[in-house]
Amino acid sequence: MARQFSLENTRNIGIMAHIDAGKTTTTERILFYTGRVHKIGEVHEGAATMDWMEQEQERGITITSAATTAQWKGHRINIIDTPGHVDFTVEVERSLRVLDGAVAVLDAQSGVEPQTETVWRQATTYGVPRIVFVNKMDKIGADFLYSVKTLHERLQANAHPVQLPIGAEDQFTGIIDLVEMCAYHYHDELGKNIERIEIPEDYRDMAEEYRGKLIEAVAELDEELMMKYLEGEEITKEELKAAIRKATVSVQFFPVFCGSAFKNKGVQLMLDGVVDYLPSPVDIPAIKGTVPDTEEETVREARDDAPFAALAFKIMTDPYVGKLTFFRVYSGTLNSGSYVLNSTKRKRERIGRILQMHANHREEIAQVYAGDIAAAVGLKDTTTGDTLCDDKDPVILESMQFPEPVIQIAIEPKSKADQDKMSTALQKLQEEDPTFRAWTDQETGQTIIAGMGELHLDIIVDRMRREFKVEANVGAPQVAYRETFRKSAQVEGKFVRQSGGRGQYGHVWIEFSPNEEGKGFEFENAIVGGVVPREYIPAIQAGLEDAMQNGVLAGYPVVDIKAKLFDGSYHDVDSSEMAFKIAASMALKNAAAKCDPVLLEPIMKVEVIVPEEYLGDIMGDITSRRGRVEGMEARGNAQVVRAMVPLSEMFGYATSLRSNTQGRGTFTMVFDHYEEVPKSIAEEIIKKNKGE
């Protein structure tokens, strides 16, 4: 099957926004107008095409970025719907990595919201060109020019309207096109009957003023246009379009559109904007990569006759076909049934079938070309961020960086049958989501799962129940405490049992002392003259190590201590390895009274980014959580606060930060070191653990 759409006529775009700005509805309308969906699905009915996981329909939020293909005016548009909730930034990061352009959807009443700031920053990091769609113009309080102002003030974005709305709220009846200098009037509910009209008289002056501002803004980035503008020559609409496209593709300018996806207004014109102003795979710089063995840098041009190279950006488990690997082809072509090299893992993979996804129905295709986004069936070893390429011409494309998980909970299956299903489920979910981890805690034998936030883990547990039919009980978020000694002391451990027959006898004197942080446990044998025979020494060390797993204060592992065995005694008949092992563990228990044991807790390095006006509240909040502020700096129009805070005080912080900053703050945290728990708090933990 030959290529249907040329590379120049292909657009790979993402739709990004704050939660609830109307992103999924906008995507729905795009699919409706491009003829992919015959009945429009509403999110509040729980039936939107893109939100195809059951949970998304219930919660009305988009969790996984479904990729879908649509056609508009002779162009193929591949759309990736991205989630707007802060716990799912990993999904946004990975979709931005493989896109060529994006549509940022704003709510006309709120303008730029916090998650818009986060996603916008991510898009800037990856150099993704954007157009802006100010949605919900029919909503009470909708204000187009205010929304444009927030783009300047909160994002410092060089954004200018290429359209103006006619009316707002329930009076929103049409749109003025500032490039073509005409207007569009809507007559019916579905917004299919659009009438192109002259700009209404009462809007004429405003349209002239904003067209002037648009030309001025674009001319600053285009010398030829600047000369014409300064000499007062007429600038044609073709020249203006070409200049806007050039400035948008080079990420120096962001055209702003308006409409109401829910009321079916403005979506087709915004689609024209995608075709007119967002880049095709040919317009963006060729992707960089390295040659596996020589580490030389190389590039892959977006051409069908170049060697094949693609990036796997998402793994999904599909109930019918099993594991789906979504990938973006950067160069070359790929046929189903062929073999490729996974250069990241150095393994050959067979491409079973290639599917083009449309939200949740799929079409099988024989071949994909440079610039396409598709899903492959049959890949065994490929995970998110891996490169797939021609094994005769290997390359590793730069992968994606994912943050470490910050919150963990214990989870246990409700029955034996759930146990086996649970380990399969956890393995599959980890393949899909690089920010989710699962492991078994050696000390308690519990299964621990960790992720990016409480909502993230809620959804994981929910998916285990729905997709893998695993019923599990979930614990509260936990902190891994430790214990150590602060003083040195000589301690005796004696175990004697002699009541007829063979007895038990073990007797040791051990000097315990604190070790440096991070040095662990050191054991020294200083016995002279054989008062304790050599064959019992390993048993004494093993006895100490076993006893250290359950500490003397609250049962947490003891770390960073030294133990020096310097004296003891034995019995010819009754001594045994077991007796000395027990004597050693008794010595450790007796040390509790003399060695000043203390509790240690993990301290996290926290970075909070907040708008200036919330700085005071945030500093107060950190102090109330026993945090130490280590430094501050301004970044753009936000303040960055760096602090050390105990992990136990950070639970629920995301929620509290959201409410303290009206959702405009973000934070990251990583483990830094262990530190002594203050006495009053330690006493509470010890009481709780002893069940008092």
Curated annotation (Swiss-Prot):
Name its cellular compartments.
Cytoplasm
Give an example GO cellular component term for this record: cytoplasm
The lineage's top-level taxon is Bacteria
Residues the record lists as binding GTP: 17-24, 81-85, 135-138
**What residue stretch is flagged as signal peptide?**
none
The record's InterPro entries line, in alphabetical order, gives:
EFG_II (IPR041095), EFG_III (IPR009022), EFG_III/V (IPR035647), EFG_IV (IPR047872), EFG_V (IPR035649), EFG_V-like (IPR000640), EFTu-like_2 (IPR004161), G_TR_CS (IPR031157)
Sorted keywords for this record are:
Cytoplasm, Elongation factor, GTP-binding, Nucleotide-binding, Protein biosynthesis
SUPFAM superfamilies for this protein = EF-G C-terminal domain-like, P-loop containing nucleoside triphosphate hydrolases, Ribosomal protein S5 domain 2-like, Translation proteins
Q: Where is the tr-type G domain?
A: 8-282
Give the record's GO biological process terms.
Answer: ribosome disassembly
UniProt-listed Pfam families: EFG_C (PF00679), EFG_III (PF14492), EFG_IV (PF03764), GTP_EFTU (PF00009), GTP_EFTU_D2 (PF03144)
Q: Name one GO molecular function term.
A: translation elongation factor activity
Q: What is its main location?
A: cytoplasm
What family does the Swiss-Prot or TrEMBL record give for this protein? Belongs to the TRAFAC class translation factor GTPase superfamily. Classic translation factor GTPase family. EF-G/EF-2 subfamily.
Q: What does this protein do?
A: Catalyzes the GTP-dependent ribosomal translocation step during translation elongation. During this step, the ribosome changes from the pre-translocational (PRE) to the post-translocational (POST) state as the newly formed A-site-bound peptidyl-tRNA and P-site-bound deacylated tRNA move to the P and E sites, respectively. Catalyzes the coordinated movement of the two tRNA molecules, the mRNA and conformational changes in the ribosome.
Q: What is this protein called?
A: Elongation factor G
